[in-house]
């Protein structure tokens, strides 16, 4: 059977346009489910920490769950390599189908897993194993979906179309948070802590089945001739593009750290540091993430006009200047509206990175190692800096040095700014 492919072209028929829209929807649906499943863990950890870990104070149990969260990130480089190779050697579509199946399995395991009182140390061990499995899946999802959405996008509007990767990434995070908020308002706290937290994990597994069906309908964007190249999906081929690889490591380190600081960790920060009720903090983050999601296409479209380099310079400079003031102000904030405003200021800055994250990286690598280059470089930096964000923040808080974390984020923003200075100017040196 002949393989159906779709590639970027500025001259489109109405049929081509429909196919591209369907491709964006199909790829995005799987991306949303992947990140919904992954973020459910973070948002539900306040409720299940005591289930899987021995009795102790709240900070200690949260620290242990954050450690498992970070451990999931350690599998991302392996996932980035494995799924990147599959995508470059056998096709983007096959890689995306496999990653959704793996995430579904991990969520089902957590939804059904007995607690510490029932199976003892097997509980945290199996929880860790499930998270490692999910980390492997997400490590492969990012690079492949970013590559796919970048390749299917139309020339001159690539920033706009590719921004939908983070629309669905944030959408998955938002949906996870929204489900938690609904459960908080419809269930007793005791029931939520006892068994209600399992509902989002089960829901994620069901949604994965829908995403799997949608992705089966997708066209392939890579060409058979490219996949047949000897260096396709190989580390040797990636080594020839090591400058791009190192640069992606640099700005992803800061981008991931800022993203996880102001999204997943922020809910805990508002509760444990600002002293807000968990329900109030969840409401603030739900509203903030919704607005954050909506502005991605706007700033992605802006990058089509001003260039990716300018967008990244805006991110690096603004994050370096305003991270400490924003986090310091949030320490003592009492008004939910003020907290929302401060969080939105931070997320607006982060949007200059998130909206173009996928297309920026994809434009830096040739087709035969594009998924591998995007996925592996992102996964390595994300595992080290993004995955450890909560753990580092909570560790510093536990020893009374919480403000040191603010300066750590600021330092990485400076690194992103310096690396961005080395990016090609608009229209020069792009691979797509």
UniProtKB/Swiss-Prot annotation:
The chain crosses the membrane at residues 33-53, 63-83, 96-116, 119-139, 163-183, 194-214, 244-264, 280-300, 310-330, 340-360, 374-394, 403-423. Keywords: Cell inner membrane, Cell membrane, Membrane, Symport, Transmembrane, Transmembrane helix, Transport. GO terms for cellular component: plasma membrane. InterPro entries: H+-coupled_symporters, MFS, MFS_dom, MFS_trans_sf, MHS_symport, Sugar_transporter_CS. It is found in: Cell inner membrane. It comes from the Bacteria. Its main location: membrane. Uptake of alpha-ketoglutarate across the boundary membrane with the concomitant import of a cation (symport system). PANTHER family: ALPHA-KETOGLUTARATE PERMEASE. This is Alpha-ketoglutarate permease. The gene is kgtP.
